[in-house]
């Protein structure tokens, strides 16, 4: 039952007209009428308390009406950012997300692989399946649960101060909803448990550098060379790529086929239309990560964020990996390079693989391309 319907029920049970309730409470007749008709769905706390006092309700009825007053409006909520028009090479991953029957999808991978772009594009494609709304929350920002409550229509004065109260209110607001939620930049399983919309009609898409648990889990790596060249062409124009396709392929290989790095390279070329593609290739060969910055996009900065969230031992091991003669590393070799025990080294390598700073396979661990250049710069 809605707040308005319950208010109408209690007013009639008390034998009061709207005018009489207005006189007792100090709330205008028009406001009472709007609330009862559902045109004003989330009254201010002082308005609610004035009506409760005027109706003379018992404590249980007062709590029920207070709870309904905190309920979110029924119109759809929307806070998705625009999606990037040039998302390429991710058709299979988009299909996996848009056809899943699970309530939770985790998209994980190294910095710069396009996790957020994929999640946002999928959310836009799924809009018609979630009529109650689509929400986007940056989990690393302050008070993500409080922000969710605000996005769901709860006024600041109705948000409980304690975390347990916020969680209970959040769960009550999700009940019966068909809503899609994107949780961007999740670090821990606890954040997923607290924030995910775990209701039968809801879907939560999580992006994370870590391999978090989920029934549907998608690992993003680099693009194929063909897709990376397609992304470059969408930014600088196909004419410049077609003029020197071999150099364009060389450029995306230098970028490690990372969507972020290719986008930065493309932006640099787009803002310098007289530059031949070869010129940027030579810059990257000479300066490596220092050449891959454009505006607020920065490959090195993305790697630094990944590294900063790891334990000190993992950071130490990564710095020592810049001394490697090759690209592969074992726990024994990492232990020798860092001056630590093999078990500690194994744990550190797993931590690095978790955030995409190392590739892991049955043969061990390896680092390539731009990540290798980053490690070299720290050695």
Language-model-derived ranges and their functions:
Residues 96, 102-168:
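Post-nucleotide-binding-loop coupling segment downstream of the phosphate-binding loop, primarily
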Residues 249-253, 260-271, 304, 316-320, ...:
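C-terminal helical "lid" of AAA+/P-loop NTPase domains
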Residues 23, 29, 45, 49, ...:
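C-terminal boundary/linker of central alpha/beta nucleotide-binding cores
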Residues 170-189:
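Conserved P-loop NTPase "ATPase switch" module shared by AAA+ and STAND
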Residues 3, 13, 46, 92, ...:
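Alpha-helical sensor/transducer elements of the RecA-like P-loop NTPase core
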Residues 74-110:
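N-terminal flanking helix/linker immediately upstream of nucleotide/cofactor-binding cores
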């Amino acid at each position: 039952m809605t707040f308005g319907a319950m208010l109408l029920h209690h007013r009639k049970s008390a034998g009061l007209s709207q005018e009489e309730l207005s006189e007792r409470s100090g709330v205008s007749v028009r406001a009472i009428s709007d609330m009862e008709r559902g045109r004003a769905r989330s009254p201010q706390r002082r308005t609610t308390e004035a009506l409760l006092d005027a109706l003379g309700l018992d404590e249980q009825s007062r709590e029920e009406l207070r709870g309904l007053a905190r309920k979110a409006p029924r119109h759809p909520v929307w806070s998705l950012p625009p999606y990037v028009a040039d998302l390429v090479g991710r058709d299979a991953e988009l299909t996996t997300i848009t056809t899943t029957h699970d309530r939770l999808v985790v998209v994980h991978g190294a910095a710069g692989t396009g996790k957020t772009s994929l999640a946002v594009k999928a959310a836009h494609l799924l809009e018609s399946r979630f009529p109650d709304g689509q929400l986007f929350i940056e989990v690393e920002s302050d008070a993500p649960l409080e922000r969710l409550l605000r996005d769901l229509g709860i006024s600041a004065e109705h948000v409980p101060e304690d975390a347990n109260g916020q969680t209970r209110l959040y769960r009550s607001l999700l009940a019966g909803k068909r809503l899609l939620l994107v949780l961007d930049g999740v670090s821990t399983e606890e954040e997923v448990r607290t924030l995910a919309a775990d209701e039968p009609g809801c879907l939560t898409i999580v992006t994370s550098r870590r391999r978090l648990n989920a029934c549907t889990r998608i690992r993003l790596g680099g693009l194929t060379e063909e897709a990376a060249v397609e992304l470059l062409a969408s930014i600088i124009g196909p004419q410049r790529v077609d003029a020197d396709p071999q150099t364009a392929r060389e450029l995306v290989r230098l970028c490690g086929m990372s969507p972020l790095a290719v986008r930065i390279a493309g932006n640099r070329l787009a803002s310098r239309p007289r530059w031949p593609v070869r010129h940027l290739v030579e810059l990257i060969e000479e300066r490596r990560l220092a050449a891959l910055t454009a505006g607020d996009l920065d490959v090195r900065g993305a790697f630094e964020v990944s590294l900063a969230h790891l334990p000190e031992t993992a950071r130490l091991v990564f710095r020592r990996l810049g001394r490697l003669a090759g690209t592969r590393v074992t726990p024994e070799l990492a232990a020798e390079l860092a001056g630590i025990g093999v078990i500690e080294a194994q744990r550190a390598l797993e931590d690095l693989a978790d955030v995409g700073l190392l590739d892991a396979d049955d043969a061990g661990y390896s680092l390539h391309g731009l990540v290798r250049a980053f490690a070299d710069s720290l050695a």
